[in-house]
Amino acid sequence: MRYLTAGESHGPQLTTIIEGVPAGLYITEEDINFELARRQKGHGRGRRMQIEKDQAKIMSGVRHARTLGSPIALVVENNDWKHWTKIMGAAPITEDEEKEMKRQISRPRPGHADLNGAIKYNHRDMRNVLERSSARETTVRVAAGAVAKKILSELGIKVAGHVLQIGAVKAEKTEYTSIEDLQRVTEESPVRCYDEEAGKKMMAAIDEAKANGDSIGGIVEVIVEGMPVGVGSYVHYDRKLDSKLAAAVLSINAFKGVEFGIGFEAAGRNGSEVHDEIIWDEEKGYTRATNRLGGLEGGMTTGMPIVVRGVMKPIPTLYKPLKSVDIETKEPFSASIERSDSCAVPAASVVAEAAVAWEIANAVVEQFGLDQIDRIRENVENMRKLSREF
């Protein structure tokens, strides 16, 4: 499977075309819109979330709530477009009209794609860069992830994302009774944190950063349960599942690091304290005594829960902007201020969930069949049976 996204932050709409989704999958616009609503929540979001009430429209590839096997086109309209029709329109404009535009940007913001993108594509107006590099694009990535999650749910595979840390505040209570319990608690938390007390401190940290004109980052975790053994490959570097998952997480705006299981903590431990002992269970078959490696060994799933974490840097758009240089005058200047969040970590956990779900679904569909969801389900069950009887 693959998908492409198109659209600018203040353009008329965002679009994604998804190819390779198996036929027969039950999906509705409500399924997708549920995920889009989750992305828009979270303490620390900016005023843009009050303007946009994202609703996806299925334009092709689905008939009577069943996928056809043909490309699926999804569209999300931007409500704010009506205020940007002249500035962001596709029609040509005169030189006088271009000069009159007050929203041309020649002052790159530190930490953004503005300057590098402007140099790469020779844009004197850096709005041409920031409109596409905006995290607004993750809207349709979450929409694609919603389709992936529907595929996984058909196969008994569950995905949940939550927040482990915001700023210096870390969740202490992280042991959940079930993935459903984790989902239930985090959906009720304004910061998507399982630890209620830590969640309150996280909100206070966000409020403090906002009051200071600053921003704040954090760490999110995604759990995947119900995976059959052997998804991925040890044969080639580019087929290793952890490699693909790492790339997916790091492709999310502002993410700067990724780890699996105990992750970087493994550097300070002996091997006996890192690797997971193999045990035999009459009901489950081969399993592990621990899950320090996060459900992945040799680029393949072990059958244990996949545990992947990503670190998100603080959003670089600040209300007390850092110094920059005007590309026209070459004079130092305080960077321009665009409407932004003070903290997007809670929303980022939803985006990370979607990104991980997509890579997992893609790997499963590729390995167990491409065309029909019923055939894929049958093949997955056969693999589960094989691993129990091996």
From Swiss-Prot:
Cofactor comment: Reduced FMN (FMNH(2)).
Keywords recorded for this protein, A-Z: Amino-acid biosynthesis, Aromatic amino acid biosynthesis, FAD, Flavoprotein, FMN, Lyase, NADP
Which pathway or pathways does this protein act in?
A: Metabolic intermediate biosynthesis; chorismate biosynthesis; chorismate from D-erythrose 4-phosphate and phosphoenolpyruvate: step 7/7
Q: Which cofactor does it need?
A: FMNH2
Q: Which residues bind FMN?
A: R132, S133, S134, N253, A254, G298, K313, P314, I315, P316, T317, R339
Give the family per the record.
Belongs to the chorismate synthase family.
Q: NCBIfam families recorded for this chain?
A: aroC (TIGR00033), PRK05382.1 (NF003793)
Q: How would you summarize the oligomeric state and partners of this protein? A: Homotetramer.
- What's the protein here called? Chorismate synthase
Q: Which species is the source of this protein?
A: Bacillus subtilis (strain 168)
**What lineage does UniProt assign to this protein's organism?**
Bacteria, Bacillati, Bacillota, Bacilli, Bacillales
Chain's gene name: aroC
